[in-house]
Amino acid sequence: LTAVSGDGGETWNAVEQQEALPDPECQSHVLRTRWREKDVYLFSNPESETSRVRGTVKFSSDGTDTWTSKRLLEPGEFGYSCMTQLPDGQIGILYEGSDITQYFAKFPVEWVLGASPE
């Protein structure tokens, strides 16, 4: 489910189901970041409609209209997640794994695209 605000969160449009972003009603995260001199978006969540499993990161370069690439970060349990861009340009992600344990991983944006960093 998504809703969009164009005024800094004062008002929101109607909530919509996003077929490209299956979710078992678990907090997900969208990160807007700079990559190759343009704004891109990364989305992290458990990619399942029924279980908190398959922690996946998806990539959009068109303002979240489409999600053109994705990579599986964690095949097992995956709950709440939060991403940030680190000082070295990589993406850091903190997520809930098995037994409510917190895990941290980092990766370059190219990893989500299935490519090696240049």
What would you call each of these model-derived segments?
Residues 1-118:
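Asp-box/BNR beta-propeller blade signature and adjacent active/binding-site loops
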